[in-house]
Every structure is written in structure tokens, then in C-alpha cells.
Amino acid sequence: RLTIFMILFAVTGYFYAQTARVQVIHNSADAAAEFVDVYLNEDLLIPDFGFRTASPFIDAPAGVEIVLSVAPAGSTSVDDAIYFAEVTLTSGETYVVVADGIVSASGYNPAPSFGLQIYPMGREVANDPANTDLLIHHGATDAPTVDIVETALGAGTIVNDISYTEFAGYLELPPFDYTIEVRTADGSTTVASYQAPLATLSLEGVALVVVASGFLDPSQNSDGAAFGLYAALPVGGNLIMLPTSASTARVQAIHNSADA
């Protein structure tokens, strides 16, 4: 599927002297959008684009207005689209595009509308080949504004007050194995804790997009996919689930018994 996407983008881009680089990530947890068709203008670019998958970075026409449309899988033409966005990409720029939100009329609470979130200044590799660069995106429809706090190495708050649909700028991190907690913005509640094993996975020099995905309360959202953090590689494919980590506390033991 991704190969077809790359070929069609290459064919379409052939007619344009200016191009931009684009990666698309499917992060809409609505069951009605589990698989979608993506169009550029009237051309079908990627059929059956699955939830929690990403395209590779590809060349797209720049300097002219294009229409990106999303239709249910199995669509017959762009006329079946349930969403479209008119965009003009900047030549030479790199973009990350994330699909979030709900298309169903009922069964989801809350139910923000489906949309494409577009981040310019994307990266295909880390700025420093000795680091791993992480772009964080909040795409969980029922999750509040949160902080992301690193606890294993004492880095503390690495993302502050990120809300649904927002991106935090790239974090340029040494490739260590981290433990990160997703906390409510006031710090009172830890939503979940995850491992980010950058060293174990040998991710030095790599730029990743990490998305908050799924539902904190599936029972209010048609028993949909549970909340988690997922990473998209520059080469695309299935998103990588960050493993959960049991929350820990710092403890000091003091021996104060006078019994001989």
C-alpha cells in the first residue's frame, strides 16, 4: 500500500518544478475511519490507509494549492470524501500531517471533528546524528491537557501543557533509555507511564513522531482503542507502541533500631 502511495505521489509531482516533503500519520481512533482512502486533488494516492500507520516521507507538489481529501476505504472517487483540506505547501519544506478526530455522528464522547493537523519544519533525520529527535503530538480526543515528565534520569518536565491537536517542538535527546509519565497539567494525576528505549532500539540519528493515540475511556467511545503513545518512523509503516512502565517512587531507607 505504501509503495503505491509513493509511486502515485512521484507521478503527480513530476508535473511540478517545486516540491515539499510530507509524511502522513493516521491517528483517528474512530472505528468508522479504521481504514480510509487518501486523495490528492482527484487522484487516489493511498487506498486502505490503516489506523496507527504512517506513510514514508515523500515528495509532494509545492507552490500551488492542492486538495487533500479523505474518503471511506473502498471509495469510487474523490466525490466520496468525508473531509478535505486546501493547502499550499512551501517548496523545500518538510511537513508532518496527522489525521485525528471523529467522523461518527454518535458513540463518542467527546467527539471533536475529524481533521488533518499539519506541522511544518518536520525532520527526516536528527539534527545531531548523536541524538534522537522526538516530535510530540497530542491526538487523543478524550485526554486533557497534559505534561510529559521524564522520571528515570531526572530530566523532569520535557513537554509542558500540550492539548489535543497540538504539537510540541522537537526534543533533541541523547539516545538513552527513558521513562516518561503523562500527567495532568496540574501534576496531580499520572495518566500513564511509558518506556522510551532509545538506546536499546539504537535510534541515534533518527527523528521520530510520537503521538498520543486512542481513548482514556474506551467505554465512552464505542469500546475503541485504548490510550497509548505510538512512534512513527521516517520510513513509515505500522506505528511502534511504547511499552508501559509501572510507576515507581523514590525511597530512602534509614536504619534507626537501637536493638543490638
Model-predicted segments: where are they?
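Sec-dependent N-terminal signal peptides
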Residues: L2-V11
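Intrinsically disordered, low-complexity polar regions and short flexible loop motifs
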Residues: Q18-A260
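Sec/Tat signal peptide C-region and signal peptidase I cleavage site
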Residues: G13-A17
